[in-house]
Curated annotation (Swiss-Prot):
It comes from Influenza B virus (strain B/Hong Kong/8/1973). Homodimer. Interacts with and inhibits human G1P2 conjugation by UBE1L. This is Non-structural protein 1. Binds and inhibits the conjugation of the ubiquitin-like G1P2/ISG15 protein to its target proteins. Since G1P2/ISG15 is an early antiviral protein, NS1 may inhibit the host antiviral response. Prevents EIF2AK2/PKR activation, either by binding double strand RNA or by interacting directly with EIF2AK2/PKR. Also binds poly(A) and U6 snRNA. A motif (Nuclear localization signal) lies at residues 50-55. Residues 1-93 are annotated as: RNA-binding and homodimerization. GO terms for biological process: symbiont-mediated suppression of host ISG15-protein conjugation; symbiont-mediated suppression of host PKR/eIFalpha signaling; symbiont-mediated suppression of host type I interferon-mediated signaling pathway. It is found in: Host cytoplasm; Host nucleus.
Length: 281
């Protein structure tokens, strides 16, 4: 089964998160304008309402992780999102967008833009995936939790109990787990804790996630070059479970970095947000 696996590498930064939220806000603005023209059918109206609720929730959660000077309302993000659409549609890489900084690389074969092939600039200048060390950085007194032959419910509880006894700051978590008695995965995670007034500690920021198969081969690497801040726990109900399943089945669909991060976080004191049917495997 492991022979069917491929290495998935993902790079994520705060700029990409803001760009995505702003772009979706621009889409919402377009939906609303279409609705004003009475051009949306019932499924379209339903999608508009669901998108608005989702964005309001995501913006509220995301703003908590931003300095007060950088927090924006939905209306402010709509305006930026519309600007983004104009830049994207007219393929103007020199325009620049808040939270979305394009750059050019010479590529004469690109028919859409003869002089350049543009993309969003890596959040940490000069550092791309190939430049980042494969293993998560070493941390002092890392905690190691071993999970074997354990269902999801018990595994989550053990992780919660073990992790919440650790100190603040960065940590490394190793999860060794058998999957359907076929594949044992080793997952290394770096992150940062926040200590709340009541003494409860929660994982607030995910820095790195590596996953290895039983032969020690890296099968997935989640990298946050600037730190990946969790956006919305509701996105992560079943992501960690599906992450294991994808490794086991050699799934070809790329693993979304943000969803994976939120999924990992949902295992740390966020059990109440997990869907009841996830239960035991």
């Amino acid at each position: 089964m492991a022979d069917n696996m491929t290495t998935t590498q993902i790079e994520v930064g705060p700029g990409a998160t803001n760009a995505t939220i702003n772009f979706e806000a621009g889409i919402l603005e377009c939906y609303e304008r279409l609705s004003w023209q009475r051009a949306l059918d019932y499924p379209g109206q339903d999608r508009l309402n669901r998108l608005k609720r989702k964005l309001e929730s995501r913006i509220k959660t995301h703003n908590k992780s931003e300095p007060e000077s950088k927090r924006m309302s939905l209306e402010e993000r709509k305006a930026i999102g519309v600007k983004m659409m104009k830049v994207l549609l007219f393929m103007n890489p020199s325009a620049g967008i808040e939270g979305f900084e394009p750059y050019c690389m010479k590529n004469p074969s690109n028919s859409n833009c003869p002089n350049c092939n543009w993309a969003d600039y890596p959040p940490t200048p000069g550092k791309c995936l190939d430049d980042i060390e494969e293993e998560p950085e070493n941390v002092d007194d890392p905690t190691e939790i071993v999970l074997r032959d354990m269902n999801n419910k018990d595994a989550r509880q053990k992780i919660k109990e073990e992790v919440n006894t650790q100190k603040e700051g960065k940590f490394r978590l190793t999860i060794k787990r058998d999957i359907r008695n076929v594949l044992s995965l080793r997952v290394l995670v770096n992150g940062t804790f926040l200590k709340h007034p009541n003494g409860y500690k929660t994982l607030s920021t995910l820095h790195r996630l590596n996953a290895y198969d039983q032969s020690g081969r890296l099968v997935a690497k989640l990298v946050a070059t600037d730190d990946l801040t969790v956006e919305d726990e509701e996105d992560g109900h079943r992501i960690l479970n599906s992450l294991f399943e994808r490794f086991n089945e050699g799934h070809s669909k790329p693993i979304r970095a943000a969803e994976t991060a939120v999924g990992v976080l949902s295992q740390f004191g966020q059990e109440h947000r997990l869907s009841p049917e996830e239960g035991d495997n």
